[in-house]
Structures are given as C-alpha cells and as structure tokens.
Amino acid sequence: MWKYGQNQGNQGPSSGGGGGGGPNMMPMGGFGMQHGNMQQMHMSPQHQQQQQQMGMMGGPGSMQMNPQGPGGPGGLMPGMSPQHQMQQQQQQQMMQQQMMVPQQGVGVGVGMGGGVGMGGGGVVPQQQQQQPQQNMPQQNIPQQQQQLNPVAGIPPGGAGGSNNMLAISQQNPHKEINIVQLSRLGQETVQDIASRFQEVFASLKGIQPTSHRENSSEKKVQEYFRTIRLLFKRVRIIYEKCNDAGMDYMSAESLIPYRDEPEPRIEPSLCDEYRKVLQENHELIETVKLKNRQLREIIDRTRIIIWEINTMLAMRRS
C-alpha cells in the first residue's frame, strides 16, 4: 500500500490540469502510516486486526474517488483558479489532521487515501467514509463476542440455563427412587451432621466466659444449629422415602430359625366346602376308632372262650 501511494504521488505532476494535489498530500499519507504504526505497537492483536480492516476499507474508498477529476489528481476541477485549488487543499489537510488526532486507528486509512490523492470534491465522500469506519468497531465487537462464545463453549445465559436444567432434573417426579442412592445420601447427611456438631463444640470451646459476649460467635453457633436442624429434617425425609419404597421391617430374630423352638405351622385358608369335608373326615376317623375298639374287645373275649374250652377238654381226658 505504501508503494501504491508513492506511485500515485509520482504520477500526480504528469497528469494534465493541475499537478499539486498528489505530491502535497503524500507526506500526510506517510505521517498517517507512521502514526498508525507507532500506535499499533501499544495495542492488542485484536485492535490491530480491526485497524487493518478499517484501513483496507478506507483505502479502496479513497481510491474510488480519484477518477472524479479528469486530467489531474482527484477532486481538482479544470475550471477553478489556482488560489481556490490551494485553499481546498489546505482545508483537506486540516480535516485530515483533525481526523488523525481523535481516531488513532484511522491514521492508516487516511494516509493511504492521502497517498493516492484526494481533491476538493472528495470532502463530502470522505465524511461519509468516516461514518462507516466509526461504525466498524461497534460491529466487530459483537462479532468477536460471538466468536469467543463458541470457543468457550458457554452461550449467553449459559450459567442460568445449566442451573435450570439441574433444578428440572432434581425435581423430576417421574424418576424412580433408588433405595441405594437414598441410603447413600442419608449416610452423607449423617456424616455432615457429625462434622457440624464437631464445629459447634470447637466454637463453644473457643468462647471464653466473659461479661461481654461476641455477637459474631453467637451468630455463628446459631447458624450451625440452624444447619443441623435442616440436616435432621433431610434425614427424616430420606428415612420416610426409604420405608415407603422398601419392604416391611422384619426383625433379625424372626428371620433366624432356632432349633429349640417349634417351627410355626402356616394354616391354610379354609373355605366352607373344605371345612365340611374335614368335619366328615374327623367323624369317619372317630367311627373307625370305635370299630377298632369293638373288634379288639371281641377278639379278647373270643380268646378267653377258647382258653376255657381247651381247659375243659384237658380235664375230661384226665
């Protein structure tokens, strides 16, 4: 770009119709380049990229304004007097100096435009060019933020969205309750309660029995007790959920069989027909027992009779 400005400055005198525009504005371009380079040394890489983009936009804009004046540097009208042309050039130089002082990064673009050469007709387009250059940093800032957000992996409002997702996942009522997880949570809560009590004892041990009590220590102990109360409530809720989700409590002694104690018999459920049949069975059993008793008596009497008959036969023979 610097060589291009030098070539355009050197071509200024050769063109007919006024040769003072290009060479006079060339030092301004050089000053703009030096001023912009000195300021870029103290800037971050992002600001330097923005300045380079703005300079590239400023350069072509000024290059397009050169063809306005035929036969000479851009903006010099052929029918104007030399004094009027010199006044226009001085006005342009003053405006360029004013633009270079407040806008540090615009010096590169202005220097390039001066190197190419701008005439009196380029004052209004130069102001129009200044407005998009001022709007460029405002447009680049959201673009850089959009580029940084995907790299970081956190969209705008990402923290709030993750917290909402956690709250929804914790408050999901359709999720199955796992007794093992509840038991583990209850165990951690009990350990937390024990650690809180240790902190309470340590804080109470550090308090000295003086007439003036410190409000900070009292507030600290009260905060500990409030936290312990909440932890006990949590343990109670976990205990109720475990009992509701688990099976009924059975003592260990009832599950261990002992040899000395008789095994309990499980009575089946009895219906009416079964009861009737069972009653008939009992009656038949009683009847059979009675018949057996009677048969036994008959057998005993028959045996006695046989013994008596045998005795009588033996006595007759003798």
Curated annotation (Swiss-Prot):
InterPro entries: Mediator_Med30_met. Residues 14-33 have a biased composition (Gly residues). Residues 1-92, 120-142 are annotated as: Disordered. It is found in: Nucleus. One of its GO terms (biological process) is regulation of transcription by RNA polymerase II. One of its GO terms (cellular component) is mediator complex. It holds the Pfam family Med30. Keywords: Activator, Nucleus, Transcription, Transcription regulation. GO terms for molecular function: transcription coregulator activity. Residues 1-13, 34-55, 78-92, 124-142 have a biased composition (Low complexity). Its main location: nucleus. Belongs to the Mediator complex subunit 30 family. Component of the Mediator complex, a coactivator involved in the regulated transcription of nearly all RNA polymerase II-dependent genes. Mediator functions as a bridge to convey information from gene-specific regulatory proteins to the basal RNA polymerase II transcription machinery. Mediator is recruited to promoters by direct interactions with regulatory proteins and serves as a scaffold for the assembly of a functional preinitiation complex with RNA polymerase II and the general transcription factors. Component of the Mediator complex, which includes at least CDK8, MED4, MED6, MED11, MED14, MED17, MED18, MED20, MED21, MED22, MED27, MED28, MED30 and MED31. This is Mediator of RNA polymerase II transcription subunit 30. It comes from Drosophila melanogaster (Fruit fly).
